[in-house]
Amino acid sequence: MEIAAGYLSPYFITDPARREAKLEGPCFLIVQGKLASARQMLRVLEQVANSGRSLLVVAEEVEGEALATLIVNKIRGSLSCCAVKAAGAKEERDAVIRDLVTVTGAKMVSDEEVASLALDDLGGADRAVVTVNRTQVLGAARLN
């Protein structure tokens, strides 16, 4: 599956020569709405980091503390992660998010529900490759 949206910061790049963020066996945090508070995500980040998996965050907006926390965790090597803004008009964006939920087996949640997610709610795939303007999700849903 391919999404016409790319990484929100070049700090997520793992392959500088190709300007790509490559995530192996990623979990997916799919948020319908804006993700701005780091506090919302702490439990999810801890669970993913402890599992040894990577994390791809897809939301209508990822900003402020939430984006900064993801970047810091990536730079420190605590968590392999990337954030992508679900772009497009509302109907198009909602359709892309629904398709992503189907492909990955992840649960779509509102920003208020993020703190209550378990690792099992994050679905998965074999691999994700993110560039400045596109995201590819490769492989079928992989549940833990």
Per-region residue spans from a language model:
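Long, structured protein-protein interaction/assembly regions in large complexes
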Residues: 1-144
